[in-house]
Amino acid sequence: MYPRVMHAVCFLALSLVSYVAVCAETKVATNCLVKSENTHLTCKCSPNNTSSNTGNGSKCHAMCKCRITEPITMLGAYSAWGAGSFVATLIVLLVVFFVIYAREEEKNNTGTEVDQCLAYRSLTRKKLEQHAAKKQNIYERIPYRPSRQKDNSPLIEPTGTDDEEDEDDNV
């Protein structure tokens, strides 16, 4: 997988874990007599359908639940729970995600070492091929000349004697 996809998945998993940590509300069958920072008493009014002949004919029976919310410990202490905490956590993580990759994009715009190395190699290869082609053309234009070795044999073999040359001088 690509590293960006893996990091995005990790950020989403972390946001889900933080959502679970913030929203970890356990319903306890107590009457919330011991008041602490983590206990919340929520009550709802449900009409009681008893056949009583009273004045208004409807009674409200309060149904209360005591909830204990566990404070968040991962991303810092803020007192938000429910869907708001998930959205806030997701926004914070996405901002961090995009800040990290904006910095990484700035580094990549200067060029990575691998790309520079490949570009240098291809340029060097092209220059070497051009140089070899020029040398080939030069060697094709110059006729073949065997190298002269230093041996003590004379270049011109004597065919006659020196007497013939002396005769020409007398004339």
Swiss-Prot record:
Q: Which residues cross the membrane?
A: 80-100
Keywords recorded for this protein, A-Z: Glycoprotein, Membrane, Signal, Transmembrane, Transmembrane helix, Virion
Compositional bias, Acidic residues, is annotated for 160-171
Describe its membrane topology: Single-pass membrane protein
Spell out the subcellular localization from the entry: Virion membrane
A Pfam family cross-referenced in the UniProt record is Cytomega_TRL10
Disulfide cross-links? none
Q: Which family does it belong to?
A: Belongs to the HHV-5 RL10 protein family.
Looking at the keywords, is Membrane present? yes
Q: Which InterPro entries match?
A: Cytomega_TRL10
Identify the species of origin: Human cytomegalovirus (strain AD169)
Q: What is this protein called?
A: Protein IRL10
Q: Which GO terms describe its cellular component?
A: membrane; virion membrane
What are the boundaries of the region Disordered? 133-171
Signal sequence span per UniProt?
A: 1-25
State which residues carry a glycan (glycosylated). N48, N49, N56, N108
Q: Does the keyword Translocase belong to this entry?
A: no
